[in-house]
A protein has these predicted regions:
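Short runs within selected transmembrane alpha-helices of multi-pass transporters and secretion channels
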Residues: 1, 7-18, 36-51, 133, ...
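Generic alpha-helical transmembrane segments of integral inner-membrane proteins
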Residues: 12-20, 24, 42-53, 91, ...
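Interfacial helix-capping/hinge residues at the ends of transmembrane alpha-helices
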Residues: 22, 101, 134-138, 218, ...
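Short alpha-helical transmembrane segments in multi-pass integral membrane proteins
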Residues: 30-84, 140-207, 249-267
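Transmembrane helix-bundle signature of multi-pass secondary active exporters and lipid flippases
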Residues: 50, 77-143, 163-171, 201-211, ...
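Small-residue-rich hydrophobic transmembrane alpha-helices
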Residues: 1-7, 11, 114-172, 176-178, ...
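Hydrophobic/aromatic residues within transmembrane alpha-helices of membrane transport systems
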Residues: 3, 13, 25, 32, ...
Length: 267
């Protein structure tokens, strides 16, 4: 329905809340993995409830109604096909993230705390590229349905250029201010956590162009009614990421940096 600002605000708020709760539960209360889990569940629940309430209040067309029931001309099968592919894609992504998190945890609480905070900053940093991919998907789907293929071609050409330019800018900012960004959530005396988190941000931030392109590819294939290809891309991306993370981090000379570098390689 064209409103991408509200989900962006709620998702950003959820990420900030997650960071704050991670610091409280993991760094201050020393709750470890359980604390990180609590922080994630609470922040996502707040975001989800907030979005549901907003939708019910602001979008009458999306409210459930049992007064009119009709399966005539219903595209239920198509909805199931699209949603199943999207659900499996999200499940694969979460499973991959879980495996990476488990590997990170094996390096101790300092690395775990740094990763927990840095990955939230990382998520906020590339969030605009992700939302750009979602908007790109909507534009592609509308023109694909209208058979306006010339507009799709032009959109693809310009969107990749715009996304790449924006991602380069964000990469530069994250690389320059990585310590400052970590310092927003970690006290100055915890220098080791800041150093590890900064290393993660510089490594990931140097390759935001890759994830920007990946989001556009996801959006393109969803837009042309081929969500299964987006699923395949996700499996390949995460499979590469997880396999390399476990392989590279096994070398003592590389250590946790092997996890950091495997993520953008997977993009």
């Amino acid at each position: 329905i064209g409103n991408s600002l509200t989900p962006l605000i709620l998702l950003g708020s959820s990420s900030v809340l997650n960071i704050i709760l991670d610091i409280i539960f993991v760094a201050d209360l020393d709750m470890g993995v359980k604390g990180a889990a609590y922080a994630t569940v609470i922040s996502q629940a707040v975001s989800g409830v907030g979005l549901c309430v907003y939708t019910l209040v602001k979008e009458p067309l999306l409210r459930l109604s049992f007064k009119k029931k009709s399966w005539k001309d219903c595209s239920f099968g198509e909805v199931v096909r699209m949603s199943t592919a999207a659900s499996v894609q999200q499940s694969v992504m979460n499973f991959g993230i879980l495996m990476i998190q488990g590997l990170v945890n094996s390096f101790g609480t300092t690395v775990m705390a740094a990763f927990t905070v840095a990955v939230k900053i990382d998520t906020v940093a590339y969030m605009p590229a992700q939302e750009f991919g979602n908007a790109f998907s909507l534009f592609i789907s509308q023109n694909y349905g209208a058979k306006k293929y010339d507009r799709i071609k032009n959109c693809v050409k310009y969107s990749f250029g715009i996304s790449a330019a924006f991602c380069v800018l964000i990469s530069i900012l994250v690389a320059i201010f990585s310590n400052n960004l970590m310092g927003l959530f970690i006290s100055d005396d915890k220098t080791e956590i800041i150093a590890v988190g900064s290393q993660y941000l510089v490594t990931e931030g140097s390759f935001y162009v890759g994830i920007g392109i990946l989001f556009l590819l996801y959006g393109y294939y969803r837009g042309i009614n081929r969500p299964e290809i987006a699923l395949v891309l996700t499996v390949i991306s995460l499979g590469t990421r997880v396999a390399l993370a476990y392989f590279l981090s096994g070398f003592e000379a590389i250590g946790v940096f092997g996890i950091w570098i495997s993520i953008p390689i997977g993009w």
